[in-house]
């Protein structure tokens, strides 16, 4: 698990968006972006070449980049079925892996303890995987009579529900997760994050908690939003759970203990309405949000974000490098089998640590590798047998020569 505490910010936030037609450029982690793009290109080229070879040769191997990607992820089989089996390691089968990711997050950040202080709380699950997040909260809250809002994160629907017609109640816990395609669309990713900021400032209860699943933090607007969160919440964490996919930059922002007084003092909601609300409903494709606040980001703050990018990015690069090396290796089937066995054990250990019931897997012998070993043993036995026969023949020949010499000596003596 990667765990970072974002520095507390006591600045007066000044909303002053910069909106231009130019493409959005990265704000930090330039070298990481370069290396990630480089290795993505290598993977795409290898995958295209493999597809071409498989099309031309129906007997070609079925080991794809996508398959190796699954094998390389250490905790893949907690939620997905183990290859060659119809079972996953965990006996608990939520519809999404976010169930297990949030389980780690709740434990590390002591969110369960905070939630237990109230008998009834208001929870908003703004994710397409809300069935998994609801199941987790029901398990942790022991089916308390909580008020629940569950909506798939559809941009227009979310805007209408929370911005056009603000909620009558304040929300104690927000859980946000975007659509898979939104994370790869930079413009939509930034607009989603601004919408999340609006929702939290407008609807979060005092001392409330928000959890947002995000991706890489490369752009100024995303850093600005983190900077605002560090001002209006007592604590802000960046966490990549160990169970998250190692080949992705996904992580969670955990914002604890909202301070309503800061929002009132800085007139943050009024500033957002005056400067950014129209941007949220503007569907122009030629307008990009490059920045949100007029404050200069302190070096210590940006360096902390950079640190998280470097560590998580290095893990991504190493995982991609491992995928390429396995794919090019002549003994890739053997390497994949070894990795699979090791990762099944890691998944079992994770389940035991988190008190999740798990299935038991008996180690199966690879019949092809076993056959090869048997053939090698047979060949070795045959070689030993041939050597023994040659040795026996040589001994018999030597004995015959000695006998002939003896007879000759006896004749000479006579």
Which sequence ranges carry the predicted segments?
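Structured alpha-helical segments in the cores of large, soluble enzyme domains
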Residues: 110, 162-176, 189-206
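Conserved acidic residues
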Residues: 121, 170-172, 234
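Long, intrinsically disordered low-complexity tandem-repeat segments
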Residues: 381-406
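Intrinsically disordered, low-complexity glycine/charged-rich regulatory or linker segments
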Residues: 1-166, 285-378, 382
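Receiver (REC) domain switch-region micro-motif
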Residues: 123, 174, 210
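Conserved beta-strand elements of beta-rich interaction domains across eukaryotes
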Residues: 128-131, 179-181, 216-217, 243-244, ...
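Conserved Class I SAM-dependent methyltransferase catalytic core
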Residues: 183-238
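Class I S-adenosyl-L-methionine
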Residues: 221-279
